[in-house]
């Protein structure tokens, strides 16, 4: 087993290292999208992701939101607290299990969500103009494969 404290036998070409490239791409895309909604709606990236998940899958508990958006519990909890305070999200009662506290968008939250979704979809469409239709299908298929394989690798570590 290699010693992680020893000098590496080869240099890491960061600019071609897949995890780095994916992270940078995600950050650039996320920041560009954030620039569209941050000012008008005063939302952080995490807050919008929580709202997007609830807009699509509600009701969800905070833990379920975290699983859907692949984000740690602390970040989700903070975002949920801010959204609750602003009246964009509300807790619902789970009659079957009183320990559960599912979340959903409030009427105000649904209004904000409805105004951001077209901006997000328009940005996605502009981003995809860099690819032709075949490349887009390939990108989607390859992204799905890498996502599934990364999950398998993480479970098998």
Descriptions of predicted regions:
Residues 3-5, 81-144:
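Charged, amphipathic alpha-helical coiled-coil/dimerization segments
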Residues 13, 31-74, 155-157:
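N-terminal helix-turn-helix DNA-binding core of bacterial DNA-binding proteins
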Residues 17, 49, 74, 126, ...:
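Active-site phosphate/pyrophosphate-handling residues
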Residues 41-42, 85, 147:
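A secondary-structure capping/hinge motif
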Residues 1-41:
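N-terminal leader segment of winged-helix/HTH proteins
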